[in-house]
Amino acid sequence: MAEEHKHDESVIAPEPAVEVVERESLMDKISEKIHHGGDSSSSSSSSDDEDEKKKTKKPSSPSSSMKSKVYRLFGREQPVHKVLGGGKPADIFMWKNKKMSGGVLGGATAAWVVFELMEYHLLTLLCHVMIVVLAVLFLWSNATMFINKSPPKIPEVHIPEEPILQLASGLRIEINRGFSSLREIASGRDLKKFLIAIAGLWVLSILGGCFNFLTLAYIALVLLFTVPLAYDKYEDKVDPLGEKAMIELKKQYAVLDEKVLSKIPLGPLKNKKKD
């Protein structure tokens, strides 16, 4: 009996060690699962982040491509304000300073009314204005002796040199550019530019027969004060119409080129280019 009791104890004794080993193995497995789960979750989260970044990046490419493909009238790549020069003249034409713009347009309108409707001549108007100004100042200066008041302070007027030089330089550059364009058109290198120049001069000759130079200048000034501002507000509606018109003009020019212009003999400069 004692031997059996010892044998039973020897059999029962190892059980706690086995249980400890099993528990350790279970803990290891659980920790491994937790570790792998964290890795997978982190990898999945990183992959999700990458997917989200891709999703956010994908819509930007078509919008940028659409922006680059938007047609602008006359192929402009800058705002209307920059096209007009971007300085004070552009501010006036775009009505950035409403008082100054209204003053310039009102002065031009008054001058047109005086010279065109009232049929005043420029030299006559200048002489009459100078007569009135000199007479008023002369009488005022002499009248101060009798009424014991100070004479009028007549300001000294000087024309600054720098603005005049800048204006002359700008005019010189534009005139030289116009001369070079006319020379290029007359040399026979570009038939398309030649036809555009002839059509433009023909339209101007018709307008010149209907209006005098002062009226044409006033109409051009009014257009400068109205058309750029209206186009800047409604460019999204005007540009598609301009694109359709340009496509139609190109089609008509292609037909004209095929039937008429291609049969016209070109100048020697064009033949030299081909050689």
Swiss-Prot record:
Any single GO CC term annotated in Swiss-Prot or TrEMBL for this entry: endoplasmic reticulum tubular network
Chief location of this protein within or outside the cell: endoplasmic reticulum
Keywords (A to Z) from UniProt: Acetylation, Cell membrane, Endoplasmic reticulum, Membrane, Transmembrane, Transmembrane helix
GO biological process: endoplasmic reticulum tubular network organization; response to bacterium
Induction: Up-regulated after Agrobacterium infection.
Biased segments, Basic and acidic residues type: 1-10, 20-38
Membrane topology: Multi-pass membrane protein
PANTHER family tied to this protein: RETICULON, RETICULON-LIKE PROTEIN B1
Subunit relationships: Interacts with VirB2.
Name the UniProt record assigns to this protein: Reticulon-like protein B1
Organism: Arabidopsis thaliana
Gene: RTNLB1
